[in-house]
């Protein structure tokens, strides 16, 4: 094992299976074009402090930010940029517009309920789905009926709040979802991440400016590792091409 598979191995499997590439789909500049940013199972102030600057700048450009996390992190409530004297003298800038205090590993149930609401209210991009996805009818049938008692119990979030957030998601023109160890370190992490991906695929929030998926890495050059094929289980085609060369 190395830094490329200790943390986001589940992200790599989930994304490769769902969208054909095992890494994020956004650039840093996309944050300034997003209308909604979901920060799920991640504590930027503690583990990715420089990301707070990107989130603050995104808010300046009009983005709404929803934090979905059992922990209410101070950095998401107030942020003072250490290189800005005026901010250091002030009370700080609010980062998160809304905090959803979910149960530990309640994310799958939460996004399942969220996607149910989106499908039920027909708030999906049928053109994008038809051109860029497969299996929609089967997925739609599987999610048209959900057990709300179970979703509320597992997620710790009320049906009313999930429906409220689904409405925000449906009204947003471009969405970025970020996640880290709070998502990836569970036995069902792959399924949870794929349900998050489904939220993006339903609305066409991928492959365009200001929208996409952002697994937030922690170690240096993990993204680069995967780009050049470094893995503890090497891709056979990579090995063959190296041998051929």
Where are these regions (language model features)?
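Cofactor-pocket helix-loop regions in the catalytic cores of large enzyme subunits
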Residues: 1-220, 228, 242-245
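Flexible, surface-exposed loop regions and adjacent strand-edge segments
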Residues: 230-234
């Amino acid at each position: 094992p190395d830094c490329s598979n200790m943390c986001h191995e589940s992200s790599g499997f989930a994304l490769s299976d769902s969208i054909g590439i095992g890494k994020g789909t956004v650039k840093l500049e996309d944050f300034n074009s997003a209308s909604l940013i979901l920060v799920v199972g991640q504590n930027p102030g503690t583990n990715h402090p420089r990301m707070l600057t990107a989130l603050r700048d995104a808010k300046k450009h009009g983005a709404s930010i929803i934090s979905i996390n059992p922990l209410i992190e101070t950095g998401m409530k107030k942020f003072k940029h250490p290189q800005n004297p005026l901010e250091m003298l002030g009370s700080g800038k609010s980062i998160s517009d809304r905090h959803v205090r979910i149960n530990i590993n309640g994310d799958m149930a939460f996004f399942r309920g969220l996607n149910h609401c989106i499908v039920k209210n027909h708030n999906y991009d049928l053109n994008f789905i038809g051109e860029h996805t497969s299996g929609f009818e089967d997925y739609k049938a599987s999610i048209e009926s959900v057990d709300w008692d179970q979703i509320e119990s597992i997620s710790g979030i009320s049906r009313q709040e999930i429906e409220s957030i689904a409405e925000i998601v449906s009204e947003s023109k471009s969405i970025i979802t970020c996640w880290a160890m709070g998502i990836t370190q569970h036995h069902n992490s792959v399924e949870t991440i794929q349900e998050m991906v489904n939220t993006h695929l339903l609305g066409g929030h991928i492959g365009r400016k200001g929208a996409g998926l952002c697994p937030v890495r922690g170690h240096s050059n993990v993204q680069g590792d995967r780009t050049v094929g470094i893995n503890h289980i090497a891709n056979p085609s990579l090995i063959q091409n190296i041998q051929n060369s």
